[in-house]
Amino acid sequence: GVRAKAVVMATGGWVNRHVVRDLPPAFTNAYAQFVHAPFLVANVALTNWQFLYKLGITAAIWDRGEGNFGYTCNIRIPMQVGGYRPPLDPSKPTVLSFYTPFFYPGEDIRAQAARGRAELLQTSFREYERQILGQMVKLFGASGFDPQRDVAGLILNRWGHAYSVPYPGFYGGSHGQAPRDIIRQ
């Protein structure tokens, strides 16, 4: 083990409560009350975005109904450094980012998080690629999107514990002690 007067753990609380042996019980209990939801960010490298320009958009949102992937996407603004301001030009390459939460209405929040993490990690790259490109054809095919011509690459960022889900009672806690306030001490 490591011995020190003070330790800074630069990991998530879901890890800290299992790794730090002498963590005060109040912290361990507070960390146990957090629920972390998974999230997928898919970055699609495009050779151009003329198909979006024809629609007059740089972003889209849609119903996450049956057969749909994700619920929103947007073009990443080119990086600006110092005085350098690259143009947002539809004939130039860009990245289109898709944001995908995992939720299952009617299920307990912890069960949703666990099920979402399992789906996130068990789904193959090829399956996500199929779903994403299929969604793009559905949304943008009529305006000229062609995956063979317009897609240069795809990167998946799988976040198993992306964000804390504030369930009912989370902010007030029990007996006025909210888990987030205990952790901040």
Sequence positions of predicted segments:
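Conserved flavin/dinucleotide-binding core of flavoenzymes
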Residues: 45, 51-185
